[in-house]
């Protein structure tokens, strides 16, 4: 079976749900429920391409200037499409790989956003406009990031909570549902949303101290307060 046929099979098989960044493919007895409301994290920072690239120079110095440019463009594009703050997307990339393009997990997740090959095949078939059919996971970091944002959006629609979607990205949706069913989510899974939020807060602070980005001072105050950040507006 060719790679493209395999991807088409995954897309057409309604029972398949692809697990998160560090998990396997799971077979579900029934499809996950879709949350019947719009989930949106309205960005409060207004970033230009140049500002995002300048930030990437500070937080990801190992990336080439060309890669920073391509990554910044992709993050702005997908964040705007999904209604996310681009700093949230960068926070996920930072936690997943530390911006190391060749990062590989023990379970086979690869790249900047640690996508499993099965996840990559499934979401690239589901989102053909990204062009993932021409690649395998890890071959083009920008394609990986674009597909990861769309995969996360898919998780958020089904779990209805930003924190739950983050945990599902880390553990896999089926496994997270099993943990929640018995009310025994491992601490390492619970910690994942907090790690993303810490990176988000750090990036907001870097922006506020380095450049007059619209909304950065307000966002920094929110991030440093006791109120949760990166919540879903209902």
Mark where each language-model region is.
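Iron-associated oxidoreductase/ferritin-like identity signal
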Residues: 6-8, 23, 211
